Swiss-Prot record:
Signal sequence coordinates: none
Protein name (database record): Phosphotriesterase-related protein
Organism the protein comes from: Drosophila sechellia
InterPro entries for the chain: AryldialkylPase_Zn-BS, Metal_Hydrolase, Phosphotriesterase
Cofactor(s) the record lists: a divalent metal cation
Source organism, top-level taxon: Eukaryota
Alphabetical list of PANTHER family matching this protein: PHOSPHOTRIESTERASE-RELATED, PHOSPHOTRIESTERASE-RELATED PROTEIN
Cofactor note: Binds 2 divalent metal cations per subunit.
Family, similarity comment: Belongs to the metallo-dependent hydrolases superfamily. Phosphotriesterase family.
EC number(s) recorded for this UniProt protein: 3.1.-.-
GO biological process, alphabetically ordered: catabolic process
Length: 350
């Protein structure tokens, strides 16, 4: 029987409830730090407060405090928001921190125990530039062995075995680095063997998701068990997105809550708003793709947590779903996207 492998053990898919499929509760994002504009250097070097928050929202990757999403203050704030998520009807969170992001399994397990939210942890590799010496030269075979071990055997966390429940996020730049190609191929190989879900992180160019899927499918991975993340900042043209959808993977809009004057990690494009995300999802629903859609926030900086003036993990449930209902999306369609699709993606027979 297919089950979902959480950090506290296996559960039946129907117990997941509403699920956020791409989140982080602790990670190191300092690699993406950008020097602040000279005019705002002092504000962005200062501690995040009401007087500096406006600058941080405009330049989130120019505040070193903001990208240190792993210190004690960040963990305390994340726990508070997971509890709020639970209070507002959240059931499960898929934690996408992989090798290179300094995944904190100990904290994820503690959150699962203390909040009652199901957590599914990922294995896999982030971009090559963020790997240490012990991982940066791994072969496809070595990666495959590692991913299989993390899922089947598990890892020791405070004397207990904790097993990962999917492969992800597997991240790449563009053109895709050879190391990252190996990680994508390894994910495809192990997916074929185990049947588990996979989550991909494409670079911020339209060609990237297509190239990732080609490598993954050629390695043997199933399209219907693969999620392509961050498509709300990658493929902006609906016709092109529909063409990509023909490959059969899940289409994930996972930057809900990110609304900004410009996208600091790719200033050549404009980040779409939550309203535009909703409109695009409705277009995809009308094209018959409701069974291929997923939603999340990809929280990875402090300023998106409520303790720092942000929206928290409950934003989709409390703010986005009501707007979707107002625009004609049915409860059945919302349940498909937030409950059924995540369960179908995560369930496998280890």
């Amino acid at each position: 029987m297919s089950t979902v492998q959480t950090v506290l053990g296996t559960i039946t898919p129907n117990l997941l409830g509403r699920t956020l499929t791409h989140e982080h509760v602790a990670l190191d994002f300092e690699h993406f730090y950008r020097p602040p504009p000279p005019d705002f250097e002092s504000e962005l070097k200062a501690k995040i407060s009401m007087s500096t928050l406006g600058y941080v929202r405009l330049y989130p990757y120019s505040s070193k405090e903001n990208v240190r999403f792993y210190d004690g203050e960040a963990l305390e704030a994340a726990k508070k928001d997971v509890l709020l998520y639970k209070k507002h009807g959240g059931g499960s969170i898929v934690e996408n921190s992989s090798y290179g992001l300094k995944r904190n399994l100990e904290f994820i397990v503690e959150l699962a125990k203390s909040t009652g939210v199901h957590f599914i942890a990922g294995t896999g590799h982030y971009i090559h530039a963020m790997q240490d010496a012990s991982h940066g030269s791994l072969t496809v075979e070595q990666m495959s062995d590692l991913y299989s071990k993390d899922i089947i055997t598990g890892l020791q966390v405070n004397g207990k075995v904790v097993k990962c429940g999917f492969i992800g996020e597997v991240a790449s730049v563009y053109p895709i680095h050879d190391f990252e190609k190996n990680a994508i191929k390894a994910a495809g190989e192990i997916q074929e063997v185990l049947g588990c879900g996979v989550s991909m992180h494409p670079h911020r160019v339209t060609k990237a998701p297509f190239e990732i899927m080609r490598l993954y499918l050629e390695a043997g991975g199933r399209a219907d068990k693969c999620v392509m993340s961050h498509l709300d900042r990658t493929i902006f043209d609906i016709d092109e997105l529909l063409e990509f959808a023909k490959l059969g993977c899940y289409i994930q809009y996972d930057l809900f809550g990110t609304e900004c004057s410009f996208y600091q990690l790719n200033t050549s494009v404009d980040m779409i708003s939550d309203g535009q995300r909703i409109d695009n999802l409705i277009k995809l629903i009308k094209e018959g793709l409701v069974d291929k859609l997923l939603m999340s926030h990809d929280i990875h900086t402090k300023h998106r947590l409520t303790s720092y003036g942000g929206h928290g993990y409950h934003h989709i449930h409390t703010n986005i779903l009501p707007r979707m209902f107002d625009r004609g999306v049915t409860l059945e369609q919302v349940e498909q996207i937030t409950v059924t699709n995540p369960a179908n993606w995560l369930a496998f027979d280890p």
